[in-house]
């Protein structure tokens, strides 16, 4: 299974990196390492997560309050967004629709 991180999702990851990096030096790298591990798990587990917002699957991160929203087309997982779950649900919905 291939994984493709779309531009907006890559920007979400960078934004998350800088948020955590400003909290504590090195925490941003730890954030990225964990989120990429979560994303990598989709090679095996893509499609088993619950669907949310406009038919996106939602993978919850194991270490951080972030969710990975993705779609599966044939043998490719498309990562559309990586969002902070602490945000207003209306904002999350708006961002994904």
Predicted regions: what is each one?
Residues 2-56, 73-76, 97:
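Basic, Lys/Arg-enriched alpha-helical interface segments
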């Amino acid at each position: 299974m291939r994984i493709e991180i779309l531009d907006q999702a890559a920007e979400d990851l960078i934004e998350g990196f800088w948020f955590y990096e400003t909290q504590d030096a090195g925490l941003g790298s730890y954030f990225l390492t964990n989120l990429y591990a979560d994303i990598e798990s989709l090679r095996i587990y893509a499609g088993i997560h619950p669907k949310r917002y406009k038919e996106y699957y939602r993978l919850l991160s194991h270490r951080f309050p972030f969710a990975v929203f993705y779609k599966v087309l044939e043998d490719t997982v498309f990562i559309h967004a990586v969002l902070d779950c602490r945000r207003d649900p209306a904002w999350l919905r708006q961002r994904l629709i």
